[in-house]
């Protein structure tokens, strides 16, 4: 999915905010172990807070569950670091029990890029939060076998868009097609383009 973004000047403090230390793993082999996806965790952390994204990036392979994700953002609200800490506590409590080494961080930073405009920033975070991820269906015939899943493996911000790359897997073609259609329709609601390459 490719989400076009606009950028606009904004006064405020630039911060670098991220999550690291998640377990990660291979999206085909370990998707059923309930491991947290850093891209989804960071988007959940930032949703609805008084900020505008500059960039949000995480992961380098579509078939690997990201262990870390990072955003540069700007905010005029001096209480944002406190709000982030409260949000981290809630997000940490909801993580799978095996995620014991996760770390959240927030520090002052600089960026050469203009922040996204309000709508682009809000759309990016809303879309990231609403996108499905992980196991979608288990096999009815073989106990413990994942039938259909997807993984948001790469999140990349460029000058004019945010690109979200998934690995979609299924042993049932109809389920895979339905899941891809869900991604396409959800992306279209926010003005994102869908394209695909490769097959699993």
Q: PLM ranges: what are they?
A:
Residues 1-169:
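Midchain, well-structured core segments that form catalytic/ion-binding scaffolds
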Residues 145-200:
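Substrate-recognition/cap regions that form aromatic- and gly/pro-loop-enriched pockets
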